[in-house]
Amino acid sequence: MMLNAPLTGVPANDLADIALKLAETGLVIRDDFLPAELIEQLASEGRALRDNGGLRAAGIGRGQQFQANSAIRSDHIQWLDPETATPAQRHYLGLLEELRLAINRTLFLGLFEFEGHLALYPPGAYYRRHLDQFQGTQHRLVTVILYLNPEWREADGGQLRLYPDPADDGRFQDLLPIGGRLVCFLSGDFPHEVLPARRERLSITGWFRKRD
Ligand code: OGA
Ligand code: MN
């Protein structure tokens, strides 16, 4: 058997690189992380869910604290469930499992599981500035976002705006949600927001968590 054989199409070395970069800078961006056909498949499944009423208004907070609050975010989501995942979703989940192990080997974060959702931002939708850790809990340690939008341009809006210094609102980095782009960052270190999208915007967003 070949050592280091890629199980899911992304060489183990690339995953180790992502983990290293995450350890060094807290933020990693990888374009063309997955082949265009797989991205298109994931996107078309998202559009089918939209058409069949399979998406719900996203909320903020957990459990009792959950609120659908469209002043803060106006995207629509479906949580991923490994039991009912499509083959394309399962492929991506498999890759994330390898990434989780690679990050644990490098950062010793004790990442335990992944939770994530497909997200669709209709034209005009946004997500105001926030941290991916709910008040009083730090279970989400690493955020991983995969964008599903081919040919996204500046004029389409919908940028992910990251603030590397929580105390300095004037310093930020904008990223377009280009299909195949993977963005991975330490959840507690980067406040961020999604600027209003002028086109429908699709992504799979998730978090590696530690045990409750
Ligand atoms: C989120 C989020 C960013 C994006 O869902 O928590 O911040 O670019 N998403 O989709
Ligand atoms: Mn977020």
Regions found by a protein language model. Name each.
Residues 1-143, 147-182, 188-212:
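Fe(II)/2-oxoglutarate oxygenase catalytic core
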